[in-house]
């Protein structure tokens, strides 16, 4: 694209764009983590984080990606030989399974096609067949397929039973409605580089009293991820925290609070609706049977090299999207509408997609995708 100045747009489901106001916080002087000044910042930040989890329970921070928080959940809840139910409908459901295997759990797997969403009825059936199961591991937003589950409905099933409900909300938090306490979700994990609009490197976890009951009984080895140490030192950190990431998280939480969490959820819904309208107008098919507000997974049309779509969009037009993972590599592409993204970012991504598909020989009327996305925005913003 030598004729034009190429700007860069991250439209992948993590890392996502980081606002300049948050980047500026990260550039501030690093202060010592054991000073009263920093402990005060840490307390303010972790208390503010309760708002996005919609919980009264403490939120704890690790210097890790979301996978670290996932491992913390398994290590603190599961003892070797414990029976657990794991929903596997994508790459990150597989990660729950692999973590539970690493800690010696007796796994009951609910295996679904990638793109399907587990139902509350399937969870209830698995629990009825396995009343001795101690934990149910779910993925709220399966980033690899663009699928969101009925977490509220599942929580209605589990909260009346002697089982702990865990969800991976790494990509969902801040994009999908999540009301931890009201719904009865027992443990939630997330990461910084998605809906929280931060660089990678920080993970958050919150759990209720029901989950703490298993934490106290767990016989699994744990050290850095031992939640008992974090509870004991709260709001301080038992180990050296990611100081500048905490600055950035504080600013991100302020921005989310100013916008209002319900407005944040609604913004993500609108961007998701526009993206799906655009790809359908192009004659493309969604992978997910229950798509959500985080990312849209699209099947590569017949006769098109799926690996070329993200490559051309990135290298020629400066728009970074994601391809498929694992067995979906080359078969789908994924356009995010997550975190610090606007309607015009979405329109830019759809325009770059159209130009890329046209170059690859896919037949369609140029502009129909952009027009469909604009129609969604017009309806939402000006009532047309």
Curated annotation (Swiss-Prot):
One annotated GO biological process: glycine biosynthetic process, by transamination of glyoxylate
Keyword terms: Aminotransferase, Pyridoxal phosphate, Transferase
SUPFAM superfamilies to which the protein is assigned, alphabetical: PLP-dependent transferases
PROSITE patterns, alphabetized: AA_TRANSFER_CLASS_5
Molecular function GO terms recorded: alanine-glyoxylate transaminase activity; L-serine-pyruvate transaminase activity
Alphabetized Gene3D superfamilies for the sequence: Aspartate Aminotransferase, domain 1, Type I PLP-dependent aspartate aminotransferase-like (Major domain)
InterPro entries the record matches: Aminotrans_V_dom, Aminotrans_V_PyrdxlP_BS, PyrdxlP-dep_Trfase, PyrdxlP-dep_Trfase_major, PyrdxlP-dep_Trfase_small, SP_NH2Trfase/AEP_transaminase
Domain of life per record: Bacteria
Reaction(s) this enzyme catalyzes, per UniProt: L-serine + pyruvate = 3-hydroxypyruvate + L-alanine
EC number(s) per entry: 2.6.1.51
Cofactors demanded by this protein: pyridoxal 5'-phosphate
Pfam families the record matches: Aminotran_5
Residue(s) carrying N6-(pyridoxal phosphate)lysine: 194
Function as written in the Swiss-Prot or TrEMBL entry: Involved in the degradation of L-serine via 3-hydroxypyruvate. Catalyzes the transamination between L-serine and pyruvate to yield 3-hydroxypyruvate and alanine.
Family statement: Belongs to the class-V pyridoxal-phosphate-dependent aminotransferase family.
Record-given protein name: Serine-pyruvate aminotransferase
């Amino acid at each position: 694209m030598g004729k034009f100045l190429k700007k860069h747009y991250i439209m992948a489901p993590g890392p996502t764009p980081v606002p300049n106001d948050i980047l500026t916080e990260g550039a501030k002087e690093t202060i010592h983590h054991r000073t009263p000044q920093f402990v005060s910042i840490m307390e303010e930040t972790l208390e503010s984080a309760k708002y996005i989890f919609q919980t009264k329970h403490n939120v704890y921070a690790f210097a890790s990606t979301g996978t670290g928080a996932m491992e913390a959940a398994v290590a603190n809840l599961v003892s070797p030989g414990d029976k657990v139910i794991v929903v596997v409908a994508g790459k990150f459901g597989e990660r729950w399974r692999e973590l539970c295997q690493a800690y010696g759990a007796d796994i009951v797997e609910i295996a679904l096609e990638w793109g399907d969403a587990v139902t509350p009825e399937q969870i209830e059936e698995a629990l009825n067949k396995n009343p001795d199961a101690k934990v149910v591991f779910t993925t709220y937003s399966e980033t690899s397929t663009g699928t969101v589950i009925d977490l509220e409905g599942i929580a209605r099933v589990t909260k009346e039973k002697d089982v702990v409900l865990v969800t991976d909300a790494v990509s969902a938090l801040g994009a999908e409605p999540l009301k931890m306490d009201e719904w009865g979700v027992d443990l939630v994990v997330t990461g910084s580089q998605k809906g929280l609009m931060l660089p990678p490197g920080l993970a958050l976890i919150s759990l209720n009293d029901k989950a703490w009951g298993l934490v106290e009984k767990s016989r699994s080895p744990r050290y850095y991820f031992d939640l008992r140490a974090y509870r004991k030192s709260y709001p301080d950190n038992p180990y050296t925290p990611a100081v500048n990431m905490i600055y950035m998280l504080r600013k991100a939480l302020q921005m989310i609070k100013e916008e209002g969490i319900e407005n944040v959820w609604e913004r993500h819904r609108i961007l998701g609706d526009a993206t799906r309208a655009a790809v359908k107008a192009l004659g493309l098919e969604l992978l997910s049977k229950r798509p959500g507000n985080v990312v849209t997974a699209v099947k590569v049309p017949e006769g098109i090299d799926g690996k070329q779509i993200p490559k051309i969009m990135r290298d020629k037009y400066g728009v970074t999207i994601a391809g498929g993972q694992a067995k979906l590599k080359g078969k789908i592409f994924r356009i995010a509408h997550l975190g610090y993204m606007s309607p015009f970012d979405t329109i830019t991504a759809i325009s770059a997609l159209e130009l890329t598909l046209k170059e690859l020989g896919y037949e369609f009327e140029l502009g129909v995708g952009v027009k469909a996305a604009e129609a969604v925005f017009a309806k939402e913003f000006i009532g047309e």
